[in-house]
C-alpha cells in the first residue's frame, strides 16, 4: 500500500506538470493579442487562501464569543472535534493519540503519567492568539498525523501599549454553597502549592531512600527503631481525615500587558500574561461492574460515589520580539501549573461476596507543571526565506500521598478497618519529562516558466522526548499486638497513630513493585525523531493550485522498566522500536470562482503509541477510578488519508463548506477493559488488525442584518453558525488474525476474533457531532449574546474482554450554553462585563454497558449547571 500510494502521488505530479508545460508553451495564433486578467479568490479570506490544505481556524473573536476558558473547551466549537475527559481532543472520531498538539509549531511534553499527548485544558484562552486545525497532512508537519494537527499560536507583542485586568466569580448547582467532601491538607493549598506537608516522609528519605522499608539487617533492611521512625514520619490527620465543608465560589484573576517601541536597531516588543483560577466541582454518581450471565449480564459490584475536586491553576507567558527590515526574532516563555485536590468516598456492594458492603475513602493531590522556552526567527535572504525555531520544554507531575483506605460495614452499620492486601494504600509518584526540538525551513520562489507561481520548501526537524516515572506504594497491616475488637473500629487517624505503631498494633509495609500494585515501580521512556522534507506549492494553471511533498522520518521509541532501588542495574524489561517512513502528501485546490473553491487531498501518515499505552506501570485513572496498564508490545498505526472539500465564502468570517474524508488504518490501537479478581475494571491496550473510517462535514456561518421595523432587532447583526460531522468506522478482522496482549506481565497472542467480530466502531468515535451558535451583536452598544448548542453521540470508551460481552459506551449527549458580553465606560475607562451559563439542559455524564434489555452504569454522574460573572478593564 505504501509503495503504491507513493507511486500514484509522484506519477500524478509528473502528469500535472507535463500538462501545464504543454499548455504554457503552446504558441498563440498570429495576429492575436492576448491579455489575460485573472482575479483569484478575491472574496476568500487571506488565512484560507494562504493555505493549500483542508483546515479550520479558531480566532480570538471565536473564543471570546463562546466564552471558553481554555483551549480544550474552545476547540469543541470546531467541525469534527470532540472532547473526552474535559481535556483530550478527538479529531474526526480518532483518539488523542492520533492528534498532534503543537505550540507555535513545536511539539510539547506532557505531564500526564502514562501519556505523551498533552491535555489541552492546561492552556488558558488568555494566552492564545489563535489556533490552526489542519485536517490534511502536509510534509512540513510531523508524520504523526491521524485525525489532524492542532497548532496553538500564542499572543504576540502588541502594536501599542496596553494593560488589561480581569476578575470573575462563578459556581455550579452541584457544588457551590453545598456541604461537600474535602480534607485539610496544608495551609497553602488554596494557592495550589503544598507547604511541605505532603513531602516524602522524612523517615523514608533518611533511612529508605534507596532501599525498601523492610525490617531485618540480614536482608539489608532497617532496624526496628529505624522502621518505626519511618512509619511515624508519615503525615496523618491532615491528609487522612475526610470532612465536609461549605463550598465557596470559584474565582478567576487575569492580568496582561505589553508594549512595543522603536530603537536604532529595530522595533522591540514585549508582552506578559498572568492568570489564576480556583474552582470546585462535585461529582455524585454510580459505578457498576458486570459478569456474563446466561447470554446477558449480571451485576458484579454496585457502587455509589461522591467526589469533590478543587482545581487551582496558574499560568504565565512572557514574550519578546525584535524586528528589523526583513529579520524577525521572537522569544516565548510559558509556565503553567495546575493542581487538583480531591476527596472521594465510594460505597461498594460486592454481589459475589454475599452483598458485602465496603466504604473506600480517597484523598489525593496532583501537581502538573509545564515550562517551555522557544526561540524562533524569520529572515529574508535574497530570494530565500529562512524560518527556524528551537524549543526546550519540561513537564513534571507529582502525586504525593495518594491515600486509599477501606472499611467494611456490618449489617448494623458498624465500621471495621480492612487491613489486608492493598486496602490501606499510601502512594507517592513522580514523573519528569523533557523535550528538545529544532526545526529549520527554507522557502524559495522557483524561476520557472511552465507554471504561473511555484515555491519550493525544504526543511529538517529533530525532536527528543525523555521521561522518567517512579512510584512507591505502602500499606498498613496488622501488627503482632492487633486486637480487632479494640482497634478495628478506630477512626483512620487513630488507627495509624504513632501510639499504635509504637505498640506494634499496626505496621507499615512497602508494596513497591509487588503484584498488588504492578511490577513497574520505575520506568524510563523515550522518543527520538529526525525528519527531512521537500515540498512544492505551485499555481499549476490559472486558478489551479497544487502542493506535493515527501517527508522522511526515522524514529526510535524506547520503554524500559527498572529496579527503583538499583536504577543503574540492567533493566527488568526493555524494548526499542526503530522505524523509518517515507510519507507522501498531495493536495489540489481549484479556485473556480472568486468566492468558491474545491480542495482534494491524498496522503500517508502514521500514529505512534503513547507512553501511557506502552509503559507496563499501573496507574489509577482518577476520572473513572480504573487501573490502567500499558502494553509494551504495541506497534505503530499507519494511515492512508483521502479528503475533499467544497468552500464558499460570503464575506470575511462567513462561509459554507462541505467535505468528505476516508481513512484506512492498519493496526489501530484500542483500549480493552478486563474485569479483575476484585470485581473492578482494569484497562490495557492492543493493536486491532485494521479499520476503515469515513464521513462528511458541513459548516455554515453567516451574519444577517434584518429589516423588520423593530429597532431592537434592526440595530443588531444576527449570527447563525452551525457545523455537523458524520463519521462511521469499521474494525476489520480476518480468520488467522492475532493480537498481542500483556495483561499479566507475560505476552500472549490470542486470536483477534476472541475480542472482535469485525464491523465494530473504533474506540472513541462518535457517529454524530454537531455545534450550533445563535446570537446577536450590536456594535453601537458593544454587546454580544450567543446561545451555544453542542451534541456528541454515543461512543465506545473501552472494549470488553470478550466478544460475548458488550463494550463500555459513553453518552455525552447535548449541552446548551449561553454567553453574554457587553462593553461600557466608567469615567472614560473601557470595561467589559460578561455572564455565562453552562449546561442549561442539565446533561449528565453517562458510561454504561447494556445487554438483554438491561443497562449497568459503569461510570455515570451528575454535572449540574454552572454560572459565572466576569469583569475586565483595559488601561
Regions found by a protein language model. Give the residues of each.
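Transmembrane beta-barrel wall of Gram-negative outer-membrane proteins
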Residues: 203-345, 365-375, 584-587
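Membrane-embedded beta-barrel scaffold of Gram-negative outer-membrane proteins
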Residues: 385-391, 395-406, 456-457, 468-472, ...
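A beta-strand signature from Gram-negative outer-membrane beta-barrel systems
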Residues: 110, 122-168, 208, 215-220, ...
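C-terminal beta-signal and adjacent terminal beta-strands/loops
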Residues: 790-800, 822-875
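Gram-negative outer-membrane beta-barrel transporters
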Residues: 660-665, 682-799, 872
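Signature of Gram-negative outer-membrane beta-barrel scaffolds
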Residues: 303, 425, 429, 436, ...
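Outer membrane beta-barrel strand-and-loop segments of large Gram-negative receptors
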Residues: 24, 419, 431, 437-441, ...
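N-terminal plug
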Residues: 38-85, 90-92, 103, 108-114, ...
Amino acid at each position: 500500500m505504501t509503495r503504491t500510494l507513493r507511486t500514484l502521488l509522484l506519477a500524478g505530479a509528473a502528469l500535472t506538470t507535463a500538462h501545464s508545460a504543454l499548455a504554457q508553451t503552446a504558441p498563440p495564433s498570429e495576429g492575436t493579442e492576448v491579455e489575460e486578467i485573472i482575479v483569484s479568490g478575491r472574496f476568500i479570506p487571506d488565512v484560507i487562501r494562504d493555505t493549500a490544505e483542508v483546515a479550520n481556524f479558531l480566532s480570538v473573536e471565536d473564543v471570546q464569543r463562546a466564552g471558553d476558558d481554555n483551549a480544550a473547551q474552545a476547540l469543541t466549537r470546531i467541525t469534527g472535534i470532540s472532547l473526552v475527559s474535559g481535556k483530550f481532543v478527538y479529531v474526526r472520531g480518532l483518539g488523542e493519540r492520533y492528534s498532534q498538539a503543537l505550540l507555535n509549531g513545536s511539539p510539547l511534553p506532557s505531564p500526564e503519567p502514562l501519556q505523551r499527548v498533552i491535555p489541552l485544558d492546561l492552556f488558558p484562552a488568555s494566552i492564545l492568539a489563535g489556533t490552526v486545525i489542519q485536517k490534511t497532512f502536509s510534509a512540513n508537519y510531523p508524520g504523526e498525523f491521524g485525525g489532524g494537527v492542532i497548532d496553538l499560536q500564542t499572543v504576540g507583542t502588541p502594536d501599542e501599549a496596553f494593560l488589561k485586568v480581569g476578575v470573575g466569580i462563578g459556581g455550579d448547582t452541584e457544588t457551590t454553597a453545598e456541604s461537600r467532601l474535602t480534607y485539610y491538607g496544608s495551609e497553602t493549598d488554596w494557592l495550589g502549592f503544598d507547604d511541605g506537608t505532603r513531602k516524602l516522609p522524612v523517615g523514608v528519605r533518611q533511612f529508605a531512600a534507596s532501599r525498601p522499608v523492610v525490617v531485618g539487617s540480614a536482608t539489608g533492611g532497617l532496624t526496628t527503631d529505624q522502621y518505626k521512625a519511618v512509619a511515624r514520619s508519615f503525615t496523618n490527620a491532615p491528609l487522612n481525615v475526610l470532612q465536609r465543608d461549605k463550598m465557596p465560589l470559584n474565582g478567576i484573576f487575569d492580568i496582561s500587558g505589553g508594549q512595543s517601541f522603536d530603537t536604532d536597531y529595530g522595533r522591540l516588543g514585549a508582552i506578559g500574561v498572568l492568570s489564576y483560577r480556583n474552582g470546585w466541582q462535585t461529582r455524585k454518581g454510580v459505578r457498576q461492574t458486570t459478569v456474563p450471565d446466561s447470554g446477558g449480564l449480571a451485576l458484579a459490584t454496585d457502587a455509589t460515589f461522591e467526589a469533590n475536586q478543587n482545581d487551582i491553576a496558574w499560568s504565565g507567558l512572557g514574550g519578546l520580539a525584535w524586528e528589523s527590515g526583513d529579520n524577525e526574532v521572537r522569544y516565548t516563555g510559558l509556565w503553567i501549573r495546575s493542581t487538583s485536590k480531591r476527596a472521594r468516598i465510594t460505597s461498594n456492594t460486592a454481589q459475589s461476596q454475599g452483598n458485602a458492603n465496603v466504604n473506600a475513602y480517597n484523598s489525593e493531590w496532583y501537581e502538573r507543571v509545564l515550562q517551555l522556552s522557544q526561540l524562533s526567527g524569520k529572515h529574508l535572504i535574497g530570494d530565500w526565506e529562512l524560518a527556524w525555531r528551537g524549543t526546550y520544554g519540561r513537564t513534571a507531575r507529582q502525586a504525593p500521598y495518594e491515600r486509599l483506605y477501606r472499611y467494611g460495614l456490618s449489617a448494623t452499620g458498624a465500621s471495621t478497618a480492612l487491613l489486608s492486601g492493598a486496602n490501606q494504600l499510601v502512594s507517592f509518584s513522580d514523573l519528569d519529562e523533557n523535550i528538545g526540538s529544532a526545526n529549520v525551513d527554507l522557502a524559495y520562489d522557483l524561476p520557472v516558466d511552465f507554471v504561473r507561481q511555484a515555491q519550493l520548501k525544504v526543511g529538517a526537524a529533530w525532536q527528543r522526548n525523555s521521561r522518567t516515572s517512579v512510584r512507591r506504594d505502602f500499606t498498613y497491616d496488622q501488627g503482632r499486638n492487633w486486637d480487632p475488637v479494640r482497634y478495628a473500629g478506630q477512626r483512620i487517624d487513630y488507627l495509624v497513630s504513632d501510639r499504635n505503631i509504637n505498640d506494634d498494633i499496626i505496621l507499615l509495609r512497602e508494596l513497591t513493585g509487588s503484584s498488588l500494585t504492578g511490577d513497574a515501580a520505575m520506568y524510563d521512556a523515550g522518543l527520538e525523531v529526525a525528519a527531512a522534507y521537500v515540498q512544492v506549492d505551485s499555481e499549476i494553471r490559472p486558478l489551479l493550485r497544487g502542493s506535493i511533498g515527501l517527508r522522511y522520518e526515522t524514529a526510535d521509541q524506547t520503554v524500559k522498566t527498572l529496579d527503583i532501588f538499583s536504577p543503574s542495574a540492567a533493566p527488568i524489561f526493555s524494548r526499542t522500536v526503530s522505524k523509518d517512513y517515507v510519507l507522501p502528501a498531495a493536495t489540489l485546490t481549484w479556485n473556480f470562482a472568486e468566492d468558491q473553491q474545491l480542495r482534494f487531498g491524498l496522503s500517508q501518515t502514521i500514529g505512534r503509541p503513547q507512553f501511557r499505552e506502552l509503559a507496563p506501570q499501573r496507574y489509577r485513572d482518577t476520572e473513572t477510578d480504573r487501573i490502567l496498564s500499558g502494553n509494551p508490545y504495541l506497534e505503530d498505526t499507519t494511515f492512508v488519508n483521502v479528503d475533499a472539500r467544497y468552500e464558499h465564502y460570503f464575506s470575511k468570517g462567513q462561509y459554507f463548506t462541505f467535505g468528505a474524508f476516508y481513512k484506512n488504518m492498519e493496526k489501530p490501537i484500542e483500549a480493552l477493559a478486563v474485569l479483575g479478581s476484585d470485581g473492578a475494571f482494569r484497562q490495557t491496550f492492543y493493536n486491532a488488525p485494521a479499520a476503515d473510517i469515513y464521513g462528511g462535514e458541513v459548516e455554515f456561518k453567516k451574519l444577517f442584518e434584518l429589516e423588520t421595523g423593530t429597532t431592537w432587532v434592526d440595530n443588531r447583526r444576527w449570527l447563525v453558525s452551525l457545523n455537523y460531522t458524520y463519521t462511521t468506522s469499521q474494525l476489520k478482522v480476518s480468520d488467522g488474525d492475532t493480537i498481542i496482549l500483556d495483561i499479566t506481565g507475560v505476552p500472549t497472542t490470542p486470536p483477534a476474533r476472541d475480542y472482535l467480530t469485525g464491523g465494530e466502531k473504533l474506540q472513541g468515535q462518535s457517529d454524530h457531532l454537531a455545534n450550533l451558535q445563535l446570537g446577536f451583536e450590536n456594535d453601537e452598544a458593544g454587546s454580544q449574546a450567543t446561545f451555544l448548542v453542542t451534541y456528541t453521540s454515543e461512543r465506545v470508551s473501552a472494549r470488553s474482554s470478550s466478544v460475548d460481552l458488550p463494550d463500555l459506551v459513553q453518552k455525552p449527549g447535548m449541552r446548551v450554553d449561553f454567553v453574554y458580553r457587553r462593553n461600557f465606560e466608567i469615567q472614560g475607562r473601557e470595561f467589559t462585563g460578561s455572564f455565562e451559563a453552562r449546561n442549561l439542559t442539565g446533561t449528565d455524564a453517562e458510561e454504561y454497558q447494556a445487554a438483554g434489555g438491561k443497562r449497568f452504569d459503569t461510570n455515570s454522574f451528575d454535572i449540574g449547571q454552572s454560572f459565572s460573572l466576569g469583569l475586565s478593564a483595559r488601561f
